[in-house]
Amino acid sequence: ETDYIFNSILKPHQQDRILSFLGIISDPLGTDYNVNQSKIAIGSGGFLGKGFLQGTQIKYGFVPERHTDFIFCTVGEEWGFVGTMVVLALLCLLILRLMRMGERQQEPFGRIYCYCVAAILLFHVLVNVGMTIGLMPVMGIPLPFMSYGGSSLIAFTILLFIAVRLDASTRQFSLNNKF
């Protein structure tokens, strides 16, 4: 069953990514190249980073998808450990805020919606960061509100706008019922 999915459904480059991630094959100049360069970029950033637009791995094009899938390694090289922690902290605050909005909802739809948006954001953050540091196979999932790409930004913005609107209507409803 797994063989059928692996050989029939997945494309050859997807199979190579999975095999490379599992350590079955090693291709430092092919399948593993992006992840290896990403790890080098993040590691070379150190604690405070090299400075804005001063990252050598990024500046000289060693990381091919530095503005999309591997944006986190750009932050790691230019802003270091501190910069990556700030980005992760802000994304965590956003996720926690969405969960808090969900707790305030009086209708099941609003609660489920806010929790689902928080779960989607958490999934994207975990997969993207895991991908750039080599803990997950490369999947092409953007880092919310940071990766280049209009459709991702528009989709996440719409998800957040709906959640904020649901929260605002819940607050308005509770204010009207107090008086």
Name the predicted role of every residue range.
Residues 74-77, 117-121, 149-152:
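Transmembrane helix-bundle signature of multi-pass membrane transporters/permeases
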Residues 78-95, 113-114, 154:
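Hydrophobic alpha-helical transmembrane segments
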Residues 99-140, 146:
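Loop-to-helix entry and N-terminal half of a specific, functionally important transmembrane alpha helix
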Residues 127-179:
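A juxtamembrane structural motif centered on a specific transmembrane helix
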